[in-house]
Amino acid sequence: VPDSSQTQPAAFNCEGGLVLNRSSFLMKPGEALVLENFEPDVEGGYRRMNGYRKYFNHIVPQTSSASERIIGVANFANKVIACRGEKIYNGASTELATAITASETMSGSGIIKVDSISGFTTSGTLQIESEIFTYTGVSSAVNPNEFTGVTREASSTTAAAHLGNVVVSSSWTEIDTGRTSASKYRFERFNYNGTDKIIFVDEVNAPVVFDSSFNAVDVSESAVAGSKFVASFKDHMFYAGKSSTPEEVVFSIPFDEDDFTSGNGAGSIRVDDTITGLKVFRDALFIFCENRIFKLTGNTSSDFAMAPVTRSIGCLNGDTIQEFAGDLVFLGPDGLRTVAATAKIGDTELGTISKNVQSIFDANIRDSAKFESVVIADKTQYRIFFTKDGQAEGITRGVTCVMKAEGYEFSEIRGIKPTATDTFVSAGDVLVLHGDNNGFIQRQEKGNTFDGTPVLGKYRSSDLSFGDTGIRKHMQRVIINYKPESAIDAELLVRYDNENSDSTRPAAYALDSSEVAAQFGSALFSTTSGAVRFVFGGPSQPLVRQPVEGSGFSVVLRINDGGESAPYSLKGFQLEYQLGARR
């Protein structure tokens, strides 16, 4: 007979991610039944995700209606290309390196210090938050870089204080127009002749190519006008997805995206299904269809060879195809799949990597009008977003998938509704952009809110019975191990008996981050009145010993985030309890 007077400890790490396909008896303690706006952390635990903020203070100009959404975004040649309505624009963005006070005088001789002046013209206008500045020169010879000859309060704006790291952006410059009825832009960056270029297709008009000076040239061949997909493979440009020939892939001669002379190496390939995406991976071009996947290998038109990967399952949407964790990930009819697993196992369910969150995909695949995806390389993270017409951004859902040593872990996103996306890595900096329905370009992984809207993080543990659901546990305390990055606005809730409404429901307990370890080079000076006191030698992953009330046959832990604090990681919990009577 156990000694019920002794306190029993039960500790677990936060690992395994969101699991919705197992009973409470089979779930591991570290797995979650709710994991919303938290992400499986590559450093262990569950991290409250970053927000996003405007990457440009200026709205992308509309063609005819304010309801026009962003239908294309890409980073190229130190600028961002944005597509809205019938036009394409570019602009430059950076961050403020040194704060500007409201009283600082700038009347033609001011200086603004920024992280980089790359992509900006040598003179022009800038916008920082709501204030417009003009400048007459730039300097990259100093660090931080500088805008010189600055005048503030331009265009009747008012001088204001601007903190470091806020966005500094140029106005938008039109670089192409007349793209009537453009639907959705997809692009490919390439270099065939020593000049970096980018090509766009929009499902309706002729493909357009920009060089690094942003000169626009339309591809003249009518056979590829209206293409939906484009990919560069073995120095040929491949086009597919025309509404009139949805099963055909057309490719150019080598090193020329606008020459389709068959005798010089151009040609076409027809498959027996509607094409939904193209993606180059290693030494092959993968052609995704509604119900098939094909693999093209070879180097020229004389030895190109097509082979089926599977003839029983396809890709629902080409915008979900991403190179991720050493494989190609795509959305199949039964959830997320990898090409390697699908090729090896065929169309069986074993090829699906998202079984743990299958119910989320089942609920969203059927009625989502559009899908978007991004890869965040430094987090080994794939994100897919389910966009539904008429649905508010605040309730738009998505899923994060993180590759860990033990396998894939998942969580749910709520509050991001992208209409176009791009991920670009430059000098180790991962730039994750998306366009929205309001005409703005946003940068993910920046800030603590969704462009001013709170990031509401939610965590719920599995139902913890400690091996025996028949014995009552009298809870004494919960020890929380977490890693804060700044002040925390979150609370712990303890619930009992599978959250039965008749069981004890103690009031919420606030998480305390008042004494966080100071890290040289990253911590700011703190004050006795501040929300966070950085303590030299203090713990960077503190243990909070929280006495709790109540008892039950099983215990549930919840963390509810207030929405505007900096991210933090939940690392693990220890629950201490005494045994009571058997039911």
Annotate each predicted stretch with a short phrase.
Residues A225-E257:
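Carboxylate/His-rich catalytic cores and anion/metal-binding grooves
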Residues E95-S109, D115-Y185:
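Small/polar beta-strand repeat architecture
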Residues G85-E86, T195, E203-V204, S213, ...:
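Surface-exposed loop/turn positions within WD40 beta-propeller blades
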Residues Y55-T63, W172-G178, N215-E221, S262-I269, ...:
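A short beta-strand motif characteristic of beta-propeller blades
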Residues L285-T310:
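Surface-exposed extracellular loop regions of Gram-negative outer-membrane beta-barrel proteins
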Residues V1-S93, T177-G194, D303, S312-D327, ...:
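Beta-sheet repeat architectures centered on beta-propellers
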Residues R186-S220:
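Hydrophobic or amphipathic alpha-helical targeting/insertion segments
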